[in-house]
Amino acid sequence: MQRLSPGEFKTLISKERKSHFITPFALVYKTFCDLGYDQKNSDYFLNNPSEYIIAMRKNCWKEFEPFEKEFTTRMLSYLIDEERIKDMSPYDAIRDFTMEYPTHIYDLALSNTQSRRSRAGKEFESILELLMMGAGIPVDVQGAIGKSFFQKNQIGKLVDLVMPGVVQYTSNKRNTMLISAKTTLRERWQEVPEEVNRTGIREMYLATLDDSFSEETINILYEANVVVVTTIENKNFKYKNNNRVLTFEDMLQSAMELSRKWNNVSYTDSEKEEIQRSILKQIEKYSDFPYVVNYYRNRLSALFD
């Protein structure tokens, strides 16, 4: 067997990872349907967003974990030289393997960690996206429309969701909601107020599952017109007396109130065309996911009623 160099193994990890794992959105969508959320009405999502988010996060991890174990086993098996170890005891074979491939093992573990972090963020965005859809709240998604379209309309790259949409944001910022999703804040929270100042965004909701951000961080974000949003459990346990921290329940009620303000708005022909293009692009992006397609088709029908 030809020995793989660390560089060759890294390349193989990257190649195999792309083909082995389903996309974060596909995993979230599968979990969403497996848990029966596709059968829930809008009242459930409006009244129980924290419960939904916690359950989805937990079950997405349960769904993902076997994929990662299988992937790790498969990647390590590429390094096994059966001829070399055939006369060794199990102990000696394991010892020889770890001494022979410490860099390879480290690189695989590091790749798994980095992939987990990246996927966790994308999964959280997708969980919020399906939450808004379930609640019947119109929303445009950067992941479906593209960063360039968001940035062209002076919406920063850190914004993941726009309610009710990008076109509405450009015509009346006051009655729209911008949401940025971050599972944890760490030091990256500083990017958010910088983005708000740079783009002239009026206000941004920062949705997070983090429960370790300080009062100082909350105040800095608040002064920059960034509203921290977390689960009702985090709020009650860590920030009960801080009115500058909202719950997902609060955010959805605000989103619903804002969305109603667009019910009787008369759009220009060019605005309608832009909204239609945006919706059709998202239908194309999610063509394999019936629940999502149905949501966007309903939005399209409402546009021309």
UniProtKB/Swiss-Prot annotation:
<protein>
    <recommendedName>
        <fullName>Type II restriction enzyme SsoII</fullName>
        <ecNumber>3.1.21.4</ecNumber>
    </recommendedName>
</protein>
<dbReference type="InterPro" id="IPR015109">
    <property type="entry name" value="Restrct_endonuc_II_EcoRII_C"/>
</dbReference>
<dbReference type="InterPro" id="IPR011335">
    <property type="entry name" value="Restrct_endonuc-II-like"/>
</dbReference>
<dbReference type="GO" id="GO:0003677">
    <property type="term" value="F:DNA binding"/>
</dbReference>
<keyword id="KW-0378">Hydrolase</keyword>
<dbReference type="InterPro" id="IPR038365">
    <property type="entry name" value="EcoRII_C_sf"/>
</dbReference>
<dbReference type="GO" id="GO:0009307">
    <property type="term" value="P:DNA restriction-modification system"/>
</dbReference>
<dbReference type="GO" id="GO:0009036">
    <property type="term" value="F:type II site-specific deoxyribonuclease activity"/>
</dbReference>
<keyword id="KW-0614">Plasmid</keyword>
<dbReference type="Pfam" id="PF09019">
    <property type="entry name" value="EcoRII-C"/>
</dbReference>
<keyword id="KW-0255">Endonuclease</keyword>
<keyword id="KW-0540">Nuclease</keyword>
<keyword id="KW-0680">Restriction system</keyword>
